[in-house]
Each structure stands twice: as structure tokens, then as C-alpha cells.
Amino acid sequence: MPYQLENRPPDLRESMYFPEIIRGIGTITKHFLKNLFFSRDANPDILARKRGGFGHSDNVTLQYPEERAPYAPAYRGLHRLVPREDGKPRCVACYMCATICPAQCIYIEAAEYPDDPVEKYPAKFVIDELRCIVCGFCVEACPKDAIRMDSGEHTPPSYERSAQIWDEKRLLRGPPVSYQYDPWLRRGSPSIPPDKLEEMRARAKPFPTVATDEASQTPGFSVRALAAEAKDRAQAARK
């Protein structure tokens, strides 16, 4: 049964808003004092590089982008295609990554090797990093471990949307073997002989703690270099 609502006028306490204002100021002051005197950063890499705190604080300020906080080993960064030792991509253009992608940001065109008509390769492999939701489904669905998100780099800034369209040439930058936490190196693979697997494990390098332009987490993979490259392409397109 419908009933009529009665809108009563606010009383003096509600109309002045003073209690809520005081409560908000108290919350801000509490967190301010807590962060100023008693906070502890749980990241040991950050604590090791602290600049010296005020009171008992271990808060630090990193001079970004020259200094960057380290990413966790499980961080999902920019995509990269894993090359074989001969430089060809591991990808066999099975379309599993493009099919499972919820954002539909992967586009593949398949082609056949002239000397091996059984196996295919991606004649075109494009990822729109702006549409990507960084879910990692493409990495899990790939049967050949051909695509990874272990670059340790986030999407570089750019002035043009076209600079975030990554093709197979840019995606193939990076070493064929990843880092020591690579699950393929830990569990092995039927397609890799045991002696070859041990050699790959011996060559794997530890995941770096801090990414800089001088020591990037992936050789030849620099955020500043990619941003400069995108800017040069945009300037060339305007001419």
C-alpha cells in the first residue's frame, strides 16, 4: 500500500554541517599524523633506498621517471612475442589469444612458411594496447608460450593513439628466454629436451628490481626510446 512521505525540515545540527565537517577534518588529521610519524613501507627495495624520514617515518620519494619503484614479478606489463633462437616467432597463428581476448584488441593474419606448409606464422600480429584490459588471458591461452606480459614495463605515454598499436616487429623485441621465475623454465615442456631446458635455465637472469633507462628490464626495451620513436613517427606523418 502506498504511503505519503513527509519531508521534515532539517534541524539546526543538520543544517549547519559542523559535525560532519569536524568529523572529516579529524579523519584527515589522523591519517596525516599516522603517515608522518608512524608509517612503514612494506617494500624492502623502497626501504633500502629511503632518503631519511621525519621522526620514525620510512616514507620516501622516488624521483620519477628517473627512479622507479620496482614491480612485482607477477606484474602484467607490455606484451611481447617470444622469438625462437633463429629469430622467428614461436606463434603459430592459432588465433587462441585473439579468440579469448575479452577486449578484442588482438588482430592476427596467418601465413604459411614456404618450406613448411604444415606450420603457420603470423604475417600480421597487432595489439591495441589502449583497448587491452591487462587480464592476461592471452598468455594463459597460448599453447606455444609465444606471447608474454613479463616485460616489466607499462604502456609508454604518447601523443598519438596510433603509437599504441603494436605490430609484430615491436612485439618481437626481447630475449627468447625470460627470467628465472618463468613457469615454463620451472615446470619444463615436452617440446624442450632436458639438456636444452637446463641450458635455458642456466642462461635465465634474475628479474631486476628497478627499471631505468640505463638498465631496462628487457634489453633494447626502453620506455623513453619508444616514446621518442612514437613522437618521431607523428612528426613525420605531419610533414
Swiss-Prot record:
[4Fe-4S] cluster 2 binds at residues 101, 132, 135, 138. Its EC number is 7.1.1.-. It holds the Pfam family Fer4. It comes from the Bacteria. It is a peripheral membrane protein. Its main location: membrane. InterPro entries: 4Fe4S_Fe-S-bd, 4Fe4S_Fe_S_CS, NADH_quinone_OxRdtase_chainI. Its cofactor is [4Fe-4S] cluster. It is found in: Cell inner membrane. GO terms for cellular component: plasma membrane. The keyword Iron-sulfur applies. It catalyses: a quinone + NADH + 5 H(+)(in) = a quinol + NAD(+) + 4 H(+)(out). It is an enzyme of class 7 (translocase). Keywords: 4Fe-4S, Cell inner membrane, Cell membrane, Iron, Iron-sulfur, Membrane, Metal-binding, NAD, Quinone, Repeat, Translocase, Ubiquinone. Residues 81-111, 123-152 form the 4Fe-4S ferredoxin-type domain. [4Fe-4S] cluster 1 binds at residues 91, 94, 97, 142. GO terms for molecular function: 4 iron, 4 sulfur cluster binding; iron ion binding; NADH:ubiquinone reductase (non-electrogenic) activity; quinone binding. Belongs to the complex I 23 kDa subunit family. PANTHER family: NADH DEHYDROGENASE UBIQUINONE IRON-SULFUR PROTEIN 8, MITOCHONDRIAL. NDH-1 is composed of 14 different subunits. Subunits NuoA, H, J, K, L, M, N constitute the membrane sector of the complex. NDH-1 shuttles electrons from NADH, via FMN and iron-sulfur (Fe-S) centers, to quinones in the respiratory chain. The immediate electron acceptor for the enzyme in this species is believed to be ubiquinone. Couples the redox reaction to proton translocation (for every two electrons transferred, four hydrogen ions are translocated across the cytoplasmic membrane), and thus conserves the redox energy in a proton gradient. This is NADH-quinone oxidoreductase subunit I 1. The gene is nuoI1.
